[in-house]
Amino acid sequence: MSIDNSRNRLLRFGNSPDYASVVLKCKDVLKYRDTDVSVYRAIVDGNRQHPEDIALIFMGRRITYRELIAQADRVSDILTSMNIRKGDIILLGANSPQAVSILLACSRIGAGVMILTTRTNPDQFAQTIADMDIPIMFCTSDVYAYYAEGDSVDELSHVVILPFDLPIGEDTSAVEFDKGNSNVISWAAFLNFRVTETAEEVEGGYFTLTVSASTGTNGAPKGIVMENRSFIALEKILRCAGFCWNRGDIVSATLSTGVATGTSLLLLVPLIMGLTVLQSPRYPNVNPFASYLDDAAFYKANILCAPPSLWVAMISAHPEDVDLSAVKQVYSVGEPVSTAEYDMINGFLQSNHALDRLRNMYGMSEINSIATYAVDTLQSPVSAGVAVPYCSFVICDHDTLRELPFGEAGEVFIHTPTAMREYLYDPKETKEMFVRDEFGEKWVRTGDLGTLDCSGELNILGRISHRFVAPDGSYIYPYMIESVLLKMPEVLRMKMVNIVHNGSPAYALHVIPKDLSEDERLLAEKIYDALAKSGSITYLPHFIKIRDSFPRNQGGKVDMLKLAQETDGFIPLC
């Protein structure tokens, strides 16, 4: 059984070679047997000869692979004694070494982990508990307090409070929690649970490991079900693509386990490859954006990866010099990067002695991270790059699914062995997410607007859902506005949101200027005039808001939902 599409032919919806499909040229074929292994087994086998290598750095402590795997084994024995079996789902709301050992333990016994994020509100949490027979939740005390306001946590058999500030190997003591709830125990008490049954390792990789929420901009969180094989496939893709990730390299986990890229690209896959993951804690009294770079410098991190919005925030929060001379690879993920952002980030990297320039990558939560990578032959350094091995693209009309010629903008479809299995308990959304071509191959609908050239270089223009439908039925996309505004010397960044004005559809612009001291009204008028004179914008914005930053979600991206909900501070234009 093959899960691969890397045959020497075009994979496309149409039959003409002029259409925007990618020819796959991989030497090897990624087959079923290559990914039919659990993440736990891959990490154990991959580091068997290097047990004292450092797996995690957390709160100043270095945790070896031997320590991490030993705790994962202990946790899996305890979960088995608690009658947790293959196919069961537990809840996890933490980003710490304990959380990593829990992920590995569940991979060992075939259980799945539903990862809680800030986008999972108490009502959604209560619905999750009502819909699923979840026996146990692991979380920090603040996450527990957030959900304990309702009665849902009382329905769980156990709630285990994880010590945020203690790494593996420490003598953990109970943290403060509501001792009146008999189902709440400390991590120390959990580790002392009497083992009555030793865990049996579940073989294979085709069972659920994570259920995570999308951190994109397409609405409420969705339960994205990822199997073990998806993480294994991503590791093989990185090796085949020639990523220079070597044993002992330190990768900075700027994104938490609550984010798909944080769990896959910046945590589990590096552990499979024998890297060291720097888990950066977010202290409440410290600017986290500055601390990311401080930690990277102090621990001499070699690999940095973050969305453009997070890069800008880190740089803005760190005006003084920071030694990045150990950094050999730098990536941008999660959002398109503008030329201004690219120049700003690269200027910072160069001035602080990083050994590489920013390399853009593209992907989505539903494919477990990335589908493209930057190569030196790209026409544009801010493009999404070319397809990684075992992955291909096609550009289609969003409404008709008709395949489009090279260079024409349409929806991006992806074929990849890392794709999710389904949206949890949502067969309708799952069916709409996948499309099969004439060869029976399954493609993922991204909802992103993009173009593909004949060399296979992909350009992402934005989310299709962010387009504005003008009164005459024509579309105005954010990239059309950006193509005008980002050429203005006064504008650094810009986002467009749909609004309702006087009962009719309209759109507003959020703009970050290069000079925050410039008169806002004058700048708004300059922007309006530039759009009016461009000739390409047939329907002009009603409002502009000048601001110094954008809100970000847990994935580090611009939170478009929050922008759309803002109602004050706008300058009316028409």
What residue spans do the PLM features occupy?
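Conserved AMP-binding/adenylate-forming
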Residues: 61, 77-120, 253-257
